[in-house]
Amino acid sequence: MPTVDDILEQVGHFHFFQKQTFFLLALISAAFTPIYVGIVFLGFTPDHRCRSPGVAELSQRCGWSPGEELNYTVPGLGAADGAFARQCMRYEVDWNQSSPGCVDPLASLAPNRSHLPLGPCQHGWVYDTPGSSIVTEFNLVCARSWMLDLFQSAVNIGFFIGSVGIGYLADRFGRKLCLLVTILINAAAGVLMAVSPNYTWMLIFRLIQGLVSKAGWLIGYILITEFVGLNYRRTVGILYQVAFTVGLLVLAGVAYALPRWRWLQLTVTLPYFCFLLYYWCIPESPRWLISQNKNAKAMRIMEHIAKKNGKSLPVSLQSLRAAEDVGEKLNPSFLDLVRTPQIRKHTCILMYNWFTSSVLYQGLIMHLGLAGGDIYLDFFYSALVEFPAAFLIIATIDRVGRRYPWAVSNMVAGAACLASVFVPDDLQGLRITVACLGRMGITMAYEMVCLVNAELYPTFIRNLGVLVCSSLCDVGGIVTPFLVYRLTAIWLQLPLVVFAVVGLVAGGLVLMLPETKGRTLPETIEEAENLQRPRKNREKVIYVHVRKADGPLT
């Protein structure tokens, strides 16, 4: 009996139905962007200072300019290490009772300001921004700044749990059902987050979004690759990630137009309600139906695909079977990922690369909000370079191979991070160029690890290997907010130094992996172990063995 791939040979690998389905699912990929990196705008931390009762009235009475008000009433101005004092401390002065003058009002209290006692902010903060973010609304600064780290870590914890749990449910109950359920929950949680009355509820709804959003993105990825023919799977997989990049560009524009975080959150959530219409637009995966022995339903869907593509099914292709032959089933085990030396090495290197790809990708985006430039333009420019990154991958993986482009992309990302440390702030053009190179490098590395991970494991542990290794991506996402925001409190460029080290190490480790270009996917542990061996040498061994076997006959 024919397989799905056999029927797609007749009805079209990537014709009208597949293009329509790809467009619809690509919208989900683009809509996932605000959840993954929306922290840049939702959690933007503007310059701030303690709110001191009486200062505003005194400033108005004396006719101070904004600069004079800061100079007279805020500690730490001009000091190299005065950021903490300027943003988190205040003079312990009762501005309403001390009757200060308008010229150097603190001079009557102490001849030297350094002798005046300082205390923590007690009446909130004043933020230098026309809009709002979760930071400004819930005062997530100074002693409460860790709560911003937790906000982003919560969504990554959700990614970690949801990808495993909902991934299992999608294999058990079907792609379409799980996709629609994740869309509905995501839409509801996003709206509830936009109207959250306090930080705790906002955190809970963000965690719920994390539980379902990445899983929904992955289900969309699986669906489109299962609807197209074999020769198009790699291309549509990369283009599905390009749709995520389009979402980055749209997010920058929407965030610029809507500087208030609640309206921004509501706006980027509303498209998910439209995605519920996919119930009538996208069928279940025929490959999944066959795996569940629902061949009749799978055949009806293939007939629907043929009709959409303007084709007709030959009489000889009126039944379906699974692509895999029925035989002895091997039960995968976590120990299989570390039992043999080569697979153990592959597992360790892949886990590290998933972790570093997540840390560098999310970390570079988060660092944009702290670098002091135009956050909207910097975000937009850095997103643009993801397009050439995707097309470079398509152009090189089947010509040059996987290993060298992957290693170089990691090293470029690491070197760009290190170079950024030494670029002066006044060279804005050079700073943006270096940042874009780093972003392009880590984008290529991210997409390459997705591709190569599946090519290094034998069939019976391939899904398990991808699942376990890619889980380190979410662990990296959990760690990254604390890494970025805590290290910048020590030195603004310190996260870039850390990114440079882990990126360069990742590039070196990739060179220890085998090249998988032109190789069939390994079916057994033995074949996976022999991937490191050059094919030419392997042919020589077979040749010698045959000569020895023929020897006694001559």
From Swiss-Prot:
InterPro entries: MFS_dom, MFS_sugar_transport-like, MFS_trans_sf, Orgcat_transp/SVOP, Sugar_transporter_CS. It comes from the Eukaryota. Coiled coil: none annotated. The record marks C450 as: Involved in recognition of organic cations and participates in structural changes that occur during translocation of organic cations. It is found in: Basolateral cell membrane; Basal cell membrane. Changing N71Q: Higher affinity for TEA. Loss of plasma membrane localization. Loss of plasma membrane localization. Loss of plasma membrane localization. Glycans are attached at N71, N198. CDD domains: MFS_SLC22A1_2_3. Tyrosine phosphorylation of the transporter leads to activation of the transport activity. Inhibited by cGMP, most likely through a cGMP-binding protein that interacts with OCT2. This is Solute carrier family 22 member 2. It comes from Oryctolagus cuniculus.
